[in-house]
Amino acid sequence: MSLAAPKSIKPKDWQSRGNPQNLLGHSIFVVDEGPANAPVILLLHGFPTSSWDWNLIWESLKKDYRLIALDMLGFGFSDKPNRRDYSIHQQADIVEALIKKYQLKEFHVLAHDYGDTVAQELLSRQIEENGAGYWLSCCFLNGGLFPETHRALLTQKL
């Protein structure tokens, strides 16, 4: 028995599946697919990529879940302001604005790499009871979970 590899789609085809949303004054690209009444998975991409990273698992997951993925500020099809420092706190603020705009009450979080760090900030807000929505679960993939041991690449520091 062999398993066929998932079929990848081209970034321009991925772009046609999403829409820009005005979040905190920025145009943020968002893909929202799957059954409207299904459990929600919020997907946070890594560095230096975009929501397109999720395309290989998208079709399989969207059969049973409503999937919402955004391109964070400065990435993918979202705004890339010049002369701008991108902070984890700002990215978390944008994700929370999305959660509020989409009126997400509860959801799962799937985060990768840079998205892990953003998710950690969001999780901290949850613990302090001032975060948006309610997390059902969280999965961190390949990120710097422990700041004291994380060694960012030179390109991540620039």
Regions found by a protein language model. Give the residues of each.
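Flexible "cap/lid" subdomain of the alpha/beta-hydrolase fold that forms the substrate-access gate
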Residues: 2-35, 40, 48, 68, ...
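The serine-hydrolase catalytic nucleophile loop
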Residues: 47-58
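A short, Lys/Arg-enriched amphipathic alpha-helix followed by its capping loop at the start of a domain
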Residues: 56-65, 101
